[in-house]
A protein has these predicted regions:
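Positively charged, small/polar-rich N-terminal and surface patches that mediate targeting and assembly
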Residues: 1-109
C-alpha cells in the first residue's frame, strides 16, 4: 500500500518577462519540484497567445511543502508587485497528495 502525504501545489501564471525573477525566488525558497509551459488566454487587460504580438504567458506549477507554498504566495502578493501591475502575474494553490517516499518535495536546496 502506498502511503501519501499532503503537499502544496502553487500554480503561477506570469508574463514571460517575469520568468527569471519568479524562477529565482522559487529556487531561493527551496522549492525544487516545478515545471512550466507556455499558455495563452484572456485576462482583465489583454488577450495573450497571439504568435505575432510578441506577448507570452507561462504557467508554472510548483509542488512543495505547505510552509514554502505559503511563503511563495506571500511573495507574489506582496506590495513589491504593485510596481509590476502592468504584467500578468497571479497565483492560486491547492493541496495534492504525493507518495511519502518522494523526498524531492521536502528537499531544500
Amino acid at each position: 500500500m502506498i502511503t501519501t502525504k499532503v503537499a502544496r501545489r502553487i500554480i503561477v501564471v506570469l508574463d514571460a518577462a517575469l520568468k527569471d525573477l519568479v524562477f529565482e525566488k522559487v529556487q531561493s525558497l527551496g522549492a525544487c519540484c516545478y515545471h512550466y509551459m507556455e499558455v495563452s488566454g484572456q485576462g482583465l487587460h489583454a488577450v495573450t497567445g497571439n504568435p505575432y504580438s510578441g506577448e507570452g504567458l507561462l504557467r508554472m506549477e510548483i509542488v512543495t511543502t505547505q510552509e514554502t507554498g505559503a511563503k511563495l504566495l506571500d511573495w507574489i502578493h506582496a506590495a513589491q508587485f504593485a510596481q509590476l501591475s502592468h504584467f500578468a502575474l497571479f497565483a492560486f494553490a491547492d493541496n495534492v497528495e504525493v507518495d511519502e517516499r518522494d523526498q524531492s518535495i521536502t528537499k531544500v536546496r
